[in-house]
Amino acid sequence: MTKRSKAYRSAVTSIASDKLYPVEDAIGLVKETAYAKIDSAFEVALKLGIDPRKTDQLVRGVVMLPHGTGKAVRVVVFATGPSAQAALDSGASEVGGSDLVARVADGYVDFDVAISTPELMAQVGQLGRVLGPRGLMPNPKTGTVTADVGKAVKDALGGRIEFKTDKHANIHFVIGKTSFSVESLSENLSVALDEINRARPQKHKGRYIKKMFFSSTFGPSVRVALA
């Protein structure tokens, strides 16, 4: 069993494990108990009431956070010609065609978001073993397979996040850094939850969001009261 650090144990004592905290109180607690020396990510975990075994109940989507995530994002784009230049002009870290495909096939994955033009997806699709497990495979449903790669790059750099249920019906996403104000984190959360609610499967019945937790990177979690 992993031994928790003294700082972690100290942080946990300020959180009542059997209590559900209002959103702003929970945000404040996470900020107060973020003991890490780095500016930690502010993480949200949701437990949904869907049946993850049914493909028509999977929840997936993208959302633009009004205050961004606070994270420096590295974006690579599979594109050639004018599209490649548009991606570079928009701030992509790296752009390429078959040459970039070959590099990724050899193990290059030092990036956070991958975007592709439709024309190159025949090649990019062969990178499933490399990109798939890391959640980096471009997908038209999340706007990362598009002819307008310039806009996609700007969105990725400007606070765009993806969400997707795992096999246990959980969704994990980041709404900023612990250095963000309570107001900024609250607004980012509200926008994200609105989009997740819009993605509710039509055939789902019963309570949709069953539990919600906040935490910082390596910090203790706080259970949040649902409205």
UniProtKB/Swiss-Prot annotation:
GO biological process: regulation of translation; translation
Matches recorded under Pfam families: Ribosomal_L1
Coiled-coil regions listed: none
Domain of life of the source: Bacteria
Gene3D superfamilies from the UniProt entry: 3.30.190.20, 3.40.50.790
GO cellular component: large ribosomal subunit
Alphabetized UniProt keyword annotations: Repressor, Ribonucleoprotein, Ribosomal protein, RNA-binding, rRNA-binding, Translation regulation, tRNA-binding
MF GO annotations: rRNA binding; structural constituent of ribosome; tRNA binding
Subunit structure, interactors included: Part of the 50S ribosomal subunit.
Family membership noted in the UniProt record: Belongs to the universal ribosomal protein uL1 family.
Free-text function comment from the UniProt entry: Binds directly to 23S rRNA. The L1 stalk is quite mobile in the ribosome, and is involved in E site tRNA release. Protein L1 is also a translational repressor protein, it controls the translation of the L11 operon by binding to its mRNA.
Official protein name in the record: Large ribosomal subunit protein uL1
Gene that produces this protein: rplA
